[in-house]
Regions:
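Structured mid-to-C-terminal alpha-helical surface segments
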Residues: 1-55, 67-71, 82-323
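Glycine-rich beta-strand-to-loop/alpha-helix junction loops that act as flexible
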Residues: 57-61
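Betabetaalpha-Me/HNH-type nuclease active-site subdomain
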Residues: 64
């Protein structure tokens, strides 16, 4: 992906793509279109560098980009390593370092004390890209900055191969500009992505874990995006069928048990039973306490209208009724 090398054309394409749908654009804010370009570029560089197929894209960004589930944005690129437990410490550290270097090619690192982490099993790094839009920030989304997380503690299985295309590629396709796609290497590409059903289970277990914490409202507020994602995952036909299956219940129990062994944080959660969760015992009051956070944070992350708080509560109630 090299469209950014032609700065004037890049800026013009972003502005054209950000126009309303009736005006031939995508109806998505310019800051989202620009950041999406750089996220997709990093993912494409990862796909090229990951010759052994050990890196898997996961998290909320993967839902919208790979599966078209939901319409929210995230500044982070979440990557998990397959079969990390079968690698030596040095091999794993080398692999993570290699992926980080390739995915951030041409970008400047931003070292943030207390946030940047470069361990042998986990990396969290911030990078700056050259801005082409004037908008500096919308909600939690900052222009000019990417967050890359590479994690060897997760088990990203099952996964599948998905086609990824940037918003700009989508716009160029719709507007009949295939020649620009070819000239600037803007073609869609394939990538290993965590199965959406596994993502559903992980997000649900994460919410349960946070709800069992001593300071559960604070912990759940930090995961408000999970409520949004679960609403749209429930709306997906394959995920709905999965929720009805014995496979889901088995996967949920296994992952919850796994997390109890792996995560000591947040404080207090490991000693409590599932039935102690305020999401299960008193969803109405718990969600009412979280609604302000949802209404404040999610509109700035979504590029389409967000579900109402009532719709989110109904979806979460449906899912919790299954477990």
């Amino acid at each position: 992906m090299r469209l950014h090398e032609n700065k004037e054309l890049f800026a013009d394409a972003i502005q054209a793509a950000s126009r309303g749908i009736d005006d031939g654009g995508l109806g998505i804010r310019d800051i989202f279109i620009e950041k999406d370009y750089w996220i997709c570029r990093s993912l494409r560089l990862m796909a090229l560098a990951d010759t052994n197929g050990l890196a898997v894209h996961k998290g909320g960004t993967s839902l919208s980009k790979a599966y078209g589930i939901g319409a929210r944005f995230s500044e982070d690129i979440d990557i998990a390593i397959l079969d990390a437990d079968k690698m030596s410490g040095n091999k794993l550290k080398t692999l993570i370092g290699h992926l980080s270097k390739e995915m951030s090619r041409g970008l400047d690192e931003i070292v943030i004390p207390g946030a940047t982490s470069k361990g042998s099993h986990y990396r969290k790094e911030y990078f700056a890209y050259p801005r082409a839009v004037e908008t500096e920030q919308v909600g939690a989304i900052r222009s000019g900055q990417l967050l890359l997380e590479i994690n060897a503690f997760a088990n990203p299985f099952p996964y599948t191969s998905c086609t990824i295309r940037s918003f700009l590629t989508e716009f160029l396709e719709r507007s009949g500009n295939q020649s620009l796609i070819d000239e600037y290497d803007m073609q869609p590409f394939t990538l290993s992505v965590l199965d959406k059903r596994r993502t559903l289970t992980e997000k649900l277990v994460s919410l349960i874990r946070c709800s069992l914490a001593d300071n559960y409202l604070y912990e759940l507020s930090a995961k408000i995006r999970h409520f949004y994602d679960l609403h749209f995952l429930l709306d997906d036909p394959e995920c709905r069928e999965y929720l009805k299956s014995t496979e889901f219940k088995e996967d949920f129990d296994v992952l919850l048990s796994h997390d109890r062994k792996l995560f000591a944080k947040p404080d207090g959660w490991q000693t409590k039973d599932l039935s102690d969760s305020p999401l299960i015992t008193n969803l109405s009051d718990t969600w009412e306490a979280l609604q302000e956070t949802y209404n404040k944070e999610m509109p700035g992350l979504a590029y389409k209208s967000i579900p109402t708080v009532g719709q989110i509560q109904a979806s979460i109630r449906t899912i919790l009724g299954i477990i």
